[in-house]
């Protein structure tokens, strides 16, 4: 009976020690595979990112105007600021209405000037 216990204990200790060694080996393999996958994926992601930024930066002639003010809306005559009038409108000082609130408003461009 003692020999069976000793044999069982010996087999159990060997199985546990070899099993842990396999787990460490599996962890190392997983870590290596992960780094290899990251190294393969990184150039593809950088290329995709560059293409997306390139598409955003290129404006086509059909692209719509960004954030502009409509007719009779307060504006700023300084073109560097964001409060500019849409195409077909110009930023002028108001004649009667709006003189109490803002200095300039967007009006339709006069073609006779």
Swiss-Prot record:
Q: Where is the signal peptide?
A: 1-21
Q: Which residues form the propeptide?
A: 22-67
The yes or no answer to whether the keyword Acetylation is present is no
Give the UniProt subcellular location, in the record's own words. Secreted
Which pairs of positions does the record mark as disulfide bonds?
A: 68-86, 75-91, 85-106
Single Gene Ontology MF annotation: sodium channel inhibitor activity
Q: Which UniProt keywords apply?
A: Cleavage on pair of basic residues, Disulfide bond, Ion channel impairing toxin, Knottin, Secreted, Signal, Toxin
- What is one GO cellular-component annotation here? extracellular region
- Recorded protein name is U10-theraphotoxin-Hs2a
Q: Which organism is it from?
A: Cyriopagopus schmidti
